Amino acid sequence: MKIKLGVIFTCLLMMVFSAAAQQAEIDTRNPYTMVEQVGNRTFERMKNSKAQIKENPELLRTIMEEELLPYIDYQYSAFKVLGKHFDFKKADKEKLIEYIRVFRQYLITSYADALSYYDEQEVIFAPEQDFDGDKSATIRAVIRDGKRPDISVAFKVRKSGKADEWKAYDMVAEGISMLQNEIRQYEPIIRTEGIDKVI
């Protein structure tokens, strides 16, 4: 897929998903605990599968798909990249479905590729804020490894009205939005040349 998110963003995304304690189930009703729990479970499985991943790198993609992707609102992100002027009513439904499928697979690959940059850096979360009644939230954190300046990140999540659960859709690192960056880069191409250009 021609849509290419920066490696630094996917790396930071994985760092923000790290947590202090493993949980048996993910609490998607609380965006703060959801982010921490997802990361912890993902990295715990990676740690336990280190030897198998070395033998079969494709296993890392499987882990991303099973542990991380269920908590990413990839369809919402994919639609945002299409742009506000995209005419969904006139769009070829089969192409739209294929676009979402390719976008999903791209995210899996991006997260798997970025994991080689993660080296157990410390993630310090800002205190939980009241999100009662909100449909979106921004979870702020600082990534610290002692070798470089701290990196400020903000993880954006949204609440699904139907499922009543929170999912992630964007990452902002040092004021730069991963999603907005892709919208600025690809929305004009989609608008003028069509969805085929990004599949």
Go through the PLM ranges and name each one.
Residues 1-9:
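Bacterial N-terminal signal peptides that target proteins for export
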Residues 8-16:
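Bacterial N-terminal signal peptides
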Residues 17-23:
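Sec/Tat signal peptide C-region and signal peptidase I cleavage site
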Residues 25-111:
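Early exported N-terminus immediately downstream of N-terminal targeting peptides
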Residues 109-151:
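Surface-exposed, charged secondary-structure patches
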Residues 136, 141, 150-158, 190-199:
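A beta-rich soluble binding module of mature secreted/lumenal proteins
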Residues 150-180:
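Short beta-strand edge/turn micro-motifs at domain boundaries
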Residues 170-199:
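Low-complexity, intrinsically disordered terminal/linker segments enriched in charged
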